């Protein structure tokens, strides 16, 4: 649309892009549910095989939520020796999705977003202070600020084939 950018820039009270502070898409979600060890190669990283049947899973607490460019606070525990970050595709559910037929899975999705999921990996794998255990998955993912969520919400109609998306993290 011709002239669109100029019209947008002339809106009174418009905040300049460089002054915009992005926040997480949602501050108090009912549930944050994560799937873990779903990549065979990553499961090997922590000395496990990828689960068969149901995937490994964990919950995130609301105090883990931060927006992009917010600081990630590293745990100050002596057991916490290696914090890692993984870029993930976040799937935002718009309704309860229990007992949804497999062929209708997309009907429960409102959209997708980017996530940076932090893990205190040394506790999960084990170190001089604590033996490793995959049951620690929820603990090692729930330190405050360990879940950067958003800021964009991409609706399903904007993604021709979600299974063809690639997600990667790049350290700046």
Regions found by a protein language model. Name each.
Residues 1-56, 157-160, 168:
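N-terminal non-catalytic cap/leader segment that marks the start of a structured domain
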Residues 6, 10-19, 42, 75, ...:
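Catalytic-pocket segment enriched in acidic/His residues
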Residues 13, 59-73, 77-78:
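A glycine-rich (often HGG/GG-containing) alpha/beta subdomain
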Residues 22-24, 45-48, 72-83, 96-104, ...:
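A generic local secondary-structure boundary/capping motif
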Residues 49-68, 85:
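Structural signature of FAD isoalloxazine-binding scaffolds in flavoprotein oxidoreductases
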Residues 53, 57-61, 104-144:
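Flexible glycine-rich active-site/ligand-binding loops centered on an Asp-His dyad
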Residues 58, 85, 90-96:
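Short, conserved beta-strand element in jelly-roll/cupin
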């Amino acid at each position: 649309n011709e002239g669109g950018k100029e019209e947008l820039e002339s809106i009174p009270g418009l905040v300049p892009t460089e002054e915009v502070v992005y926040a997480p898409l949602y501050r108090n979600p009912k549930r944050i549910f994560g799937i873990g060890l779903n990549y065979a190669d990553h499961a090997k990283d922590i000395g496990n095989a990828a689960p068969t049947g149901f995937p490994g899973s964990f919950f995130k607490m609301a105090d883990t939520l931060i927006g992009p460019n917010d600081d990630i606070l590293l745990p100050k525990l002596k057991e916490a020796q290696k914090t890692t970050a993984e870029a993930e595709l976040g799937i935002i559910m718009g309704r309860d999705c229990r007992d949804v037929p497999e062929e209708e899975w997309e009907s429960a999705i409102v959209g997708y977003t980017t996530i940076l999921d932090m893990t205190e990996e040394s506790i999960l794998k084990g170190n001089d202070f604590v033996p490793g255990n995959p049951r620690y998955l929820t603990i090692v993912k729930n330190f405050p600020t360990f879940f950067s969520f958003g800021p964009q919400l991409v609706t399903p109609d904007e993604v021709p084939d979600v299974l063809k998306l690639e997600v990667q993290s790049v350290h700046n």
